[in-house]
Swiss-Prot record:
Organism encoding this protein: Streptococcus pyogenes serotype M1
Keyword terms: Carbon dioxide fixation, Lyase, Magnesium
NCBIfam families, A to Z: PRK00009.1
Cellular compartments per GO CC: cytosol
Active site: H138, K583
Protein name, per record: Phosphoenolpyruvate carboxylase
Keyword Transport: no
Length: 920
């Protein structure tokens, strides 16, 4: 019997109780704000939506005043938010329950390690596997930080619901506190008044480390080692999870990312992790009251204690406390040295004898900062060894062991920061350098072969650099060189791992990679033997993915590249872009091209003796590579995951997965288990069968690509339809990220960034990028020969890639609503533009019918009852928001709203994104 996924659906009765209570409180608060008469409008709207009487609903909404719209749109935005919290709480409860009762579930790490332990290479896999979630600042998180903080309080209160029901805590006081926070949310601005700055994005993402990720990653790694040990596998220093980050280093299309933001990103990280260590050591200081009159520490602990400036008479016989105090003192100095900030939380409130900081002894014996995390860990190891010498192994478990584990994982920063820039920017900078050095006057006009010859010659000219103080530089070149210089300084200061990769957006040639090498060489990050920053191509469009094999084969053939890769443990990372390939060719073409590219690139790596590792640039929606993480990883081509995989975690997905430590632990556990299972499990053993599957997919995808591009790029009215029948203009003005919605002025679909493209299709409920072109392509294949439907059904049952592909379409279709989409189509001014909707509608119906036929299902989401139930409970609420949004857009475009009222549209955008739970 297959294992089930952990889902909150097992607690539907509790969720129903919680939602009823939350709804009752929100209704009372709203009624008090607007009065009984106005609240009857909300009640009538709700009834019409539940009955799906959309014609009457449209009429009622059209008669609501702008003033009434504000509270009504807030009500219907906050209600799905509260439902989300209830579901998240009960998922966390389910996770804890299943773990504490030792129940098996899909992706459980204990099962994965147990299955692996019996294999000959089991220990090697466990030692080497490394999954890297990379948190990005992509503008899809529509919630303000203030709102997220309030929802965190509500989440904590709902965690106590069962205790309140049982009388373990005072029910009335619990209800009052819950009511208070809901009232605060209802009266707090949902929408940001100003656009986020990069520094805000850095600060915002740090709350996830502070609140959940540090603890979850540390606990999971400790458990990982313990589980391996249980099966006789002693692991040295495994890192099954390490974290990555783009915020502060991703300047592709974002002019606000600079050398200063890169430095700030690393510095804030360092501050957060050092504060964590200081807090944890303060707790250990309070706990370790062991007296030397009862148990004698070893000489190293005595040495640490003797260096402490905690000279309190009450600590004379407590060497462990004094040793921890000394370690804390050194951490404080380390924080000052690395961040130029004092230890923010190092105070008497966490148990320290703060008077010791200014004691005379501190002048005679100055405390020195740690040179590296290795030195910090050595002091902790000394305490551990002393405890072991005295037979106190039980005292090591828990806080001390987890702090030591955290040091191994994080060191003095939390996540490796990626740099990213568009290839065209690098080409412009290199062209300027070559011209300024009188080497090539017009580099951009050279052929690809000529470019590579020039670049390789310069890379071999050591230690010569191209830039000169005597030659004036453009602002762009100055800015780029400043960023690379800062990267080198941060690596020297915090360690090599703080910045390991530089990603090249829109990689189209080998010269794109050598151009980056030239820029890195200018600041000393690349020479003939070594690349301190790995050059990572990002292949994004269908054409670039098709060409990726030849590009990488040519790149890997160069001796200098082999030297660079050798210094990186023989790994070459390649990033795959899901968003642009989807916008370029549609869902099927994107998914299949990415699948084939991984197979081809893996083979090229093997030919050159290089381990190709993949970085998956996935978004929250299916149209941007989203979907269940476990299924996404286990459906990758067999052999494409060697031992390392990186994937982006973006926008609202970060909050959904890492908003609390229990759910964070579970999602990280899923990532590790999925990666290990894909590394060792080949689902289809018959090579002839997989070859036939590929032939079928090639045929279907070719048709799908043609169908998709015929509408998106060949239909002269499609551009106007998208811009008039979706809230793309309003989305672009929403203050949800520091980056512009487009790299340049938008005059065609290709110029629009993938995120607002997908976001807007989600808002008008068509979900176009996640399914268009699927139905017609499959229908053509089915109609070609008898038995083709049965072949597709067999593929769905036996091929994880195909199963995941269709399950994602199923999910997207379930969130779409063609009745609502029709109303958005009426926003278009001309009939020929509005008629585009009917092409979309025909394809939607065909896609739904074909998907159900291949799955052999009667209804959508038959395999996903949890999501089906969740959507059923929330759809009536955010369907209302769509009708409100349509009415507000009409008024805005007809100048019936003033500028202050534009935020009403933004409120509906927020609410719809909240209800869908994956916006971009």
């Amino acid at each position: 019997m297959p294992l089930k996924k952990l889902e909150s659906s097992n607690n539907q009765d509790i969720i129903a109780e919680e939602v009823a209570l939350l709804k009752e409180m929100l209704e009372n608060i709203t009624r008090r704000m607007i009065g009984d008469d106005a609240f009857t409008v909300i009640e009538s709207i709700m009834v019409l939506s539940e009955k799906q009487d959309y014609i009457e609903l449209e009429k009622v909404v059209a008669n609501i005043s702008n003033q009434e719209m504000e509270v009504i749109s807030r009500y219907f935005s906050i209600l799905p938010l509260l439902i989300n919290i209830s579901e998240d709480v009960d998922l966390a409860y389910e996770i804890n329950y299943q773990n504490n009762t030792d129940t098996d579930y899909l992706g459980k790490l204990a099962l994965t390690i147990k299955d692996l332990a019996g294999k000959d290479n089991g220990k090697d896999i466990l030692e080497q596997v490394n999954v890297v979630p990379v948190l990005t600042a992509h503008p899809t998180q529509v919630q303000r930080k203030t709102i997220l903080e309030l929802t965190t309080h509500i989440h904590k209160l709902l965690r106590k619901y069962r205790d309140a029901k049982a009388g373990v805590i005072n029910l009335e006081k619990w209800r009052q506190e819950l009511y208070r926070y809901i009232e605060m949310i209802m009266q707090t601005d949902i929408i940001r008044e100003k656009k986020l700055q990069v520094k805000n994005e850095i600060k915002n993402v740090m709350q996830y480390y502070d609140g959940s990720l540090i603890q979850a990653v540390t606990k999971l790694t400790t458990e990982y080692k313990n589980l391996a040990q249980k099966h006789g596998l002693e692991l040295d220093n495994p890192k099954p999870i390490t974290m990555g980050m783009w915020i502060g280093g991703d300047r592709d299309g974002n002019p606000f990312v600079t050398a200063e933001t890169l430095c700030l990103s690393a510095t804030v990280q360092s501050e957060v992790i050092l504060n964590y260590y200081i807090d944890e050591l303060a707790a250990l200081y309070r706990t370790f009251s062991l007296s030397s009159t009862l148990v004698q520490p070893n000489s190293e602990v005595e040495r640490l204690a003797s260096l402490s400036q905690d000279q309190s008479i009450y600590r004379g016989n407590e060497p462990y406390r004094r040793a921890f105090h000394y370690i804390q003192s050194r951490l404080k100095q380390t924080q000052i040295q690395l961040t130029n900030q004092p230890a923010a939380r190092m105070s008497s409130s966490v148990g320290l004898n703060t008077s010791a900081w200014s004691s005379p002894a501190s002048l005679e014996n100055p405390i020195l900062a740690y040179d590296s995390p290795v030195d910090f860990k050595a002091d902790l190891k000394a305490i551990e060894q002393s405890l072991l010498d005295n037979g106190n192994s039980a005292l090591i478990e828990g806080d001390l062991r987890e702090v030591m584990q955290a040091v191994d994982i994080f060191g003095f920063f939390l996540a490796s920061i990626d740099m990213r820039q568009d290839s065209s920017v690098q080409e412009a900078c290199v062209a300027e350098l070559l011209k300024g050095a009188n080497i090539v006057d017009d580099y951009s006009s050279l052929s690809e072969t000529e470019k590579c010859d020039v670049l390789l010659q310069q890379l071999m000219e050591e230690p010569r650099t191209l830039s000169s103080a005597a030659v004036a530089k453009s602002d762009l070149l100055e800015k780029e060189l400043a960023i690379y210089t800062t990267a080198r300084e941060l690596k020297d200061k915090l360690g090599e791992e703080v910045i390991k990769q530089h990603i090249i957006s829109h990689t189209e040639s080998v010269s794109d990679m050598f151009e980056l090498a030239i820029m890195l060489k200018e600041v000393g990050l690349v020479d003939q033997q070594r690349a301190r920053v790995q050059i990572v191509p990002l292949f994004e469009t269908i054409e670039d993915l098709d060409n990726a094999r030849d590009i990488m084969a040519a790149y890997l053939s160069h001796d200098i590249v082999k030297s660079w890769i050798a210094t990186n443990r023989n790994y070459q990372e390649i990033m795959l872009g899901y968003s642009d390939s989807n916008k370029d060719g549609g869902y099927l073409a994107s998914g299949w091209t990415l699948y084939k590219a991984q197979n081809e690139l893996t083979a090229i790596g093997e030919e050159h003796g290089v381990k190709i590792t993949f970085f998956h640039g996935r978004g929250g929606t299916v149209g941007r590579g989203g979907g269940p993480s476990y299924d996404a990883i286990t459906s990758q081509p067999f052999g494409s995951i060697k031992d390392r995989i990186r994937l982006t975690e973006q926008g609202e997905i970060i909050e959904n997965k890492y908003g609390n430590k229990d759910v964070a632990y579970y999602h990280l556990e899923m990532l590790i288990s999925a990666s290990i299972n894909r590394m060792v499990t080949q689902m289809i053993t018959d090579p002839n069968e997989i070859d036939s599957f590929r032939e079928i997919m090639d045929s279907i995808v070719a048709d799908s690509n043609i169908i998709y591009r015929k509408l998106v790029f060949d239909n002269p009215h499609f551009y106007d339809y998208f811009f008039e029948a979706s809230p793309i203009k309003e989305v672009s003005s929403l203050n949800i990220g520091s980056r512009p919605a487009a790299r340049k002025t938008i005059t065609e679909i290709t110029g629009l960034r993938a995120i607002p493209w997908v976001f807007s299709w989600s808002q008008n409920r068509i979900m176009f990028p996640g399914w268009y072109g699927v139905g017609s392509a499959f229908k053509r294949y089915i109609d070609r020969a008898q038995g083709n439907l049965e072949r597709l059904q067999h593929m769905y049952q036996t091929w994880p890639f195909f199963h995941s592909l269709l399950s994602n379409v199923d999910m997207v279709l379930s969130k779409s609503n063609m009745n609502i989409a029709f109303q958005y189509a009426q926003l278009a001014e001309r009939q020929d533009v509005r008629d585009v909707f009917y092409e979309i509608l025909d394809e939607w119906q065909l896609t739904k019918n074909v998907i159900l036929a291949i799955q052999d299902h009667d209804d959508l989401l038959e395999d996903n009852p949890s999501l089906k139930h969740s959507l059923k409970s929330r759809l009536p609420y955010f369907n209302v928001l769509n009708y409100i949004q349509i009415e507000l857009i009409k008024r805005w475009r007809n100048n019936q709203l003033d500028e202050n009222d534009e935020k009403l549209i933004h409120t509906t955008i927020n609410g719809i994104a909240t209800g869908l739970r994956n916006s971009g």
